[in-house]
């Protein structure tokens, strides 16, 4: 059976299918970024490819120094997921960086996002939406809000969770660090990318803590790690 489509439609479909392929090499990644308004550097592309091929099956840590473009690297990763129609995406960051994240993703990668905060969240609940996080939109929220709404985040089938300034959660191995432990539990079963310029500051246990957020079984329990 022959399908009658125009040449233009054929090109569009081919382009669409190419973008949906997994980013297992540079060619597929290039397809999802062909419209991006950003000059990528080799190390940013390499970091993104590492995240896709990470030996830590549940995610990776992007730990470039300040100014080397970790946000761009995250944008590359988010763009690829978006192009594959894996659009349940969550960015957790400090409250003062929410608008910056939203602006950069839109301006540089044409990725629309929703900043989830108390007012918009409550309005959604009042409108009968059972879980405002459960949407095929890129959602951005603060660390504090993620802690407060952890139960909703946990119930959402995220394709990817990005945690910016992740060193703020580095003491997750301490039970008294409630924000870190609550967020860790909420995203435990999801693929995660942690972003920090300082994965290790005072103790090797901080690195243990960050890695445990991605996968509890990489280093084993804290007693064995010590």
Language-model-derived ranges and their functions:
Residues 65, 94, 198:
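P-loop (Walker A) phosphate-binding loop of NTP-binding proteins
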Residues 110, 135, 160, 178-226:
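Conserved P-loop NTPase motor "coupling/switch" region that bridges the ATPase
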Residues 53-54, 80-84, 213, 217:
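Active-site catalytic microenvironments for nucleophilic, acid-base chemistry
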Residues 2-49, 71-72, 82-179, 222, ...:
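SF2 helicase/translocase NTPase motor core
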Residues 55-60, 87, 137, 190-191:
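Pre-Walker A (Motif I) flank of P-loop NTPase domains
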Residues 52, 102, 208-212:
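Short, amphipathic alpha-helical segments that act as regulatory/interfacial helices
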Residues 57-77, 166:
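Walker A/P-loop
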Residues 65, 77-81, 101, 210:
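Hydrophobic residues on the short alpha-helix immediately C-terminal to a glycine-rich phosphate/catalytic loop
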């Amino acid at each position: 059976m022959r399908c009658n489509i125009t040449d233009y439609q054929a090109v569009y479909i081919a382009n669409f299918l190419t973008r949906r392929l997994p980013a297992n090499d540079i060619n597929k990644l290039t397809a999802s970024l062909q419209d991006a308004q950003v000059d990528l550097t080799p190390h940013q592309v390499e970091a993104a490819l590492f995240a896709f091929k990470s030996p830590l099956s549940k995610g990776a840590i992007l730990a470039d120094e300040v100014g080397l473009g970790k946000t761009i690297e995250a944008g590359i990763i988010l763009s690829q997921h978006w192009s594959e129609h894996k659009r349940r995406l969550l960015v957790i960051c400090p409250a003062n960086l929410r608008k910056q994240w939203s602006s950069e993703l839109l301006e540089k990668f044409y990725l629309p996002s929703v900043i989830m905060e108390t007012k918009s969240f409550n309005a959604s609940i009042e409108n009968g939406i059972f879980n405002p996080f459960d949407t095929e939109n890129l959602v951005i929220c603060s660390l504090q809000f993620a802690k407060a709404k952890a139960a909703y985040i946990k119930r959402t089938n995220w394709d990817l969770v990005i945690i910016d300034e992740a060193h703020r959660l580095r003491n997750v191995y301490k039970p008294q660090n409630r924000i870190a432990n609550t967020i860790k539990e909420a995203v435990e079963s999801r693929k995660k990318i942690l972003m920090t310029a300082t994965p290790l500051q005072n103790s090797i246990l901080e690195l243990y803590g960050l890695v445990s957020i991605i996968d509890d079984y990489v280093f084993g329990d804290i007693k064995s790690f010590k």
